[in-house]
Amino acid sequence: MTRGDVIVGFGGGATTDVAGFLAATWMRGIDVIHVPTTVLAMADAAIGGKTGINIPAGKNLVGAFYEPIGVLCDTDLLTTLPAREVRSGLAEIVKCGFIDDPVILNLISNDAQAVLDVTSETFVEVLTRAIAVKAGVVSVDLHERTSSGGEVGRERLNYGHTLAHAIEAFKHFTWRHGEADAVGMVFAAELSHRYLGLSDEVLGRTRTILSGIGLPVTCDGVKWADLRRTMNLDKKARVDPQTGRRVLRFVGIRKPGQVAMIVNPDEAALAECFDKCSAR
């Protein structure tokens, strides 16, 4: 394979991540085209130039920013997906509704069954809107460098992901990403309710929308202390220059479409928020 060749990533998010990583590193960069075949890959993984592989220590800790020269999304490829894969991908679409485009939330609330049908016009609309959200954010902050302090650039796309990645690692990746992200969004909403004044209505709506499309809103069999240790590897964390201690940063929302960063929340508050999204 030469620099004049092209890698084609044809498959789900893991496939496009690996294909992109190979393209970024082989001969210091060759072209790559993605043809995503899952909802999650179309709405998120294949778009935006993030590539990477998972290692035992955590998710996406080895990777690179590397844009494909093209992405082809053909929803006909989704018709053979198991229902679980469709639901998992919808989590990323819901996320885009909370961080940027509340119309997505309204469409899902109005007809959850239509959204679960990948041949429906409603599904195509929410997918298209989610792609537009992701592309819009990435176009101004490809390398995730505009977030500073409480300001949020591309990191807004990680809403719910801090806890989600910890759950995935602890569960040895037996949970789909969207399933973990659904619980992560409930957790992020609880934090937002506590620190950013997110309303009771939106907090409740988070659970209602996610559970309405068959996604989990609680997580069992996991101890907070175990997840908390894994979170120290989160890519949004920073080291406090005065104390040398790693400080966690969470993406939160004041309301749908209005994002803010929650920096160094109280440890007791984190545990309490997780308790509210733990299975009983």
Briefly describe each language-model feature range.
Residues 20-114:
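A glycine/threonine-rich phosphate-anchoring loop and its flanking beta-alpha core
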Residues 1-33:
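N-terminal small/polar loop signature for handling phosphorylated ligands or for N-terminal nucleophile
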Residues 85, 91-93, 197-280:
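C-terminal charged capping/lid subdomain of soluble metabolic enzymes
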